[in-house]
């Protein structure tokens, strides 16, 4: 079942999901030791684009939280949940974590299915095995996840269609993990997956903080690099013609 926590009453003119208070949502989420996590945003840059929703749940129940309408008290409840000792399962969590860091939310324990998939197929040609959630759902579960709605979020924001789509992204990850875990054990990669997933938090924080860059010096470097490239191309062309 899909639950939506939102103070935007226009989103509840449907029977595709049910309205839930934060208390009701927590009654669904608190028993979970493994919880799937995803977000929807208005763009890719965590510092200039808004966090729209946080999705939490499992294959039986999904809770979509409309972050844009929450009260400070409700946001604190979500923060406390995400910073608990639960293991949060996601896909390409570096992206989601940067948006959570902007909100002052720092999950402790995460597992990233995309990282596990990359490790399992490390060294294979990229085209042999796609690493997206859509591809994993098909490869492991024979389930087709429709991603067409994702392109509408930037312009449309949170709509009934987006709520349903968002819930779908926290439905299948646990089942995929169970399948991946079998292969991870076969290849003796359990520690490697744990280490790489732990590093995702640091990488996300690095991305969130950014890097100080001297623009003037960097442009000067670019000019030198371009000059070297032009010279190399000129010399190569002269050699070929000769």
Segment roles from a protein language model:
Residues 107-110, 146, 151-242:
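Mixed-charge, glycine-rich, non-catalytic linkers/tails in nucleic-acid processing enzymes
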């Amino acid at each position: 079942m899909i639950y939506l926590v939102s103070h935007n009453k226009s989103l509840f003119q449907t029977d595709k999901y049910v309205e839930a208070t934060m208390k009701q949502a927590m009654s669904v989420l608190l028993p979970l030791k493994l919880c799937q996590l995803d977000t929807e945003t208005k763009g890719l840059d965590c510092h200039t684009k808004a966090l729209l929703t946080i999705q939490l749940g499992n294959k039986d129940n999904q809770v979509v939280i409309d972050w844009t309408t929450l009260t400070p008290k409700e946001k604190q409840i979500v923060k406390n949940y995400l910073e608990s000792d639960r293991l949060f399962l996601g896909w390409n969590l570096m992206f989601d974590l940067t948006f959570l860091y902007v909100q002052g939310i720092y999950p402790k324990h995460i597992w990233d299915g995309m990282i596990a998939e990359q490790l399992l197929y490390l060294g294979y040609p990229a085209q042999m095995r796609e690493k997206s959630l859509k591809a994993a759902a098909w490869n492991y579960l024979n389930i087709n996840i429709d991603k067409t709605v994702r392109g509408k979020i930037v312009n449309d924001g949170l709509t009934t269609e987006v709520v349903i789509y968002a819930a779908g992204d926290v439905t299948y990850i646990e089942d995929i993990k169970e399948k991946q875990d079998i292969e991870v054990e076969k290849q003796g990669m359990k520690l490697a997956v744990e280490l790489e997933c732990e590093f995702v938090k640091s990488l996300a924080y690095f991305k969130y903080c950014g890097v100080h860059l001297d623009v003037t010096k960097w442009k000067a470097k670019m000019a030198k690099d371009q000059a070297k490239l032009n010279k190399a191309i000129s010399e190569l062309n002269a050699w070929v013609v000769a």
